């Protein structure tokens, strides 16, 4: 069965807001990571947009071993209090991995 990838992108008005939420998200994710791995998450990446003037974006890319792992992990993620008091525009997109290139 194909793996599933979920991407979370968050856009902020200021660098300060991005940095404040970034710290919160990473601390919360660190507390969840063992359970997510147990539920079938196989990789996680996190990044900050660079080389774009006046754009403040975070992205998280999570990969799950299959659709069942995706479902179980997303239930945990969605039930978590991510402390969303800082304004942002958020997008979640999910994909079936149909091709991969490992260098």
What are the roles of these predicted feature ranges?
Residues 1-75, 92-103:
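Short S/T/G/P-rich N-terminal loop/turn motif that feeds into the first structured element of a domain
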Residues 78-85:
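A common structural junction motif
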């Amino acid at each position: 069965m194909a793996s599933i990838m979920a991407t979370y992108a968050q856009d902020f008005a200021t660098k300060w807001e991005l940095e404040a939420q970034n710290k919160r998200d990473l601390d919360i994710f660190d507390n969840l990571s063992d359970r997510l791995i147990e539920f079938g998450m196989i990789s996680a990446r996190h990044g900050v947009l660079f080389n774009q003037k006046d754009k403040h974006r975070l992205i998280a890319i999570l990969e799950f071993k299959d659709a069942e792992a995706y479902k179980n992990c997303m239930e945990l993620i969605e039930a978590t209090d991510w402390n969303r008091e800082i304004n942002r525009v958020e997008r979640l997109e999910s994909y079936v991995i149909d091709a991969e290139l490992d260098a």
